[in-house]
């Protein structure tokens, strides 16, 4: 089955209505997903990406019904993850000498997944292009850490279609392919869920990459993603939304999540929520039990919130395991400009609350006062919990509501972003490293995201003191922006 996208572009992907888990079991899919592959037939025939490996044979059968596989002139792999390149091994068995265009980093990951170093790889970088005939070119734009080091986007001139890889996508399955055909509230929900759970750690890179693409002043008539719908009507609305999400996004919202052995901490959570509402009824307050509710929905609400409260019973003087796991995920997602507080019940001592407070502080949250209740909360303790909620509401009140993000419940037609207008040739550009560094500063720059390590500043968040030379930086060091190791750094040349 194929779906006509535009002119000589067809969707040849695979819908997956039944899938529930992604990245192991870390991401729960509530609406299925699609693995989007695109066939372009100009004077040259090009296949962009494949599908998940579980659908390899079905994908090839469908493709053979559409074209002679031998007519494929080359394959573009925007990303090597198995849900993008999974059918590549089966396809290459039938057309083994077909060139594969990808980034240099993708060769390593493709070979690592498929174990075929003899394949005909062609390395591309930002600004490289291929003439596919009829006056059209494919132009490549590297997008490292969105969300893998090997990621790139591909732009088709003439048709003005951006094959955006994982960016602007969503795990959302529908028989209809285009954004203007589906339920807009459902689409927004899945886009936000996808961004908040997968792309949040790379928000600074999202902004930089979007600004780089906008600087090319290319027309964008469609954005063809790797998962979910194709953005056909006002495609730049999702670009605008990504820029908003990447800019320390927060609504007038507070999220409370907890785990409880005997419902004591649940009682506290309910009373705290009531106290917040007493003081500021306009604040959206959501309460979640991490043992019973969707973890990814909780994380999406954390992303939307100006502050969170995390509660746990104390077990063996530590927090409940599911709360510990959630805090580990929150630390990895690197939320910015948010407040937090801990609460919980205990019998012998309240170690869980202290540990939660410490973890939230380490994760970069601005932490407020904690609250502990011994045994099952009685009337006095419940009043204290409600008063605590009232105090939190006052402490976290935003005087100027205009500084908060406006919740968007559905996509709507909007004015396209300025800057995506006339088509011009692409030239290679890279994000500019910190201009404050001199050429003789003995700095090191990350080749993936351009973050600069300066010995004069150190990296206090990883315990690296001011004055530490690169040779003395420990091997466990990770780039604060892209979280890759020392091996991706090179000497800064100014």
Curated annotation (Swiss-Prot):
Pfam families: Flavodoxin_1, ODP, Rubredoxin. Pathway: Nitrogen metabolism; nitric oxide reduction. Disulfide bonds: none annotated. The keyword Methyltransferase does not apply. Fe cation 2 binds at residues 83, 166, 227. Residues 254-393 form the Flavodoxin-like domain. One of its GO terms (molecular function) is electron transfer activity. SMART domains: Lactamase_B. FMN binds at residues 260-264, 342-369. Binds 3 Fe cations per monomer. Binds 1 FMN per monomer. Residues 30-210 are annotated as: Zinc metallo-hydrolase. Keywords: Cytoplasm, Electron transport, Flavoprotein, FMN, Iron, Metal-binding, Oxidoreductase, Transport. Its cofactor is Fe cation; FMN. Anaerobic nitric oxide reductase; uses NADH to detoxify nitric oxide (NO), protecting several 4Fe-4S NO-sensitive enzymes. Has at least 2 reductase partners, only one of which (NorW, flavorubredoxin reductase) has been identified. NO probably binds to the di-iron center; electrons enter from the NorW at rubredoxin and are transferred sequentially to the FMN center and the di-iron center. Also able to function as an aerobic oxygen reductase. In the N-terminal section; belongs to the zinc metallo-hydrolase group 3 family. This is Anaerobic nitric oxide reductase flavorubredoxin.
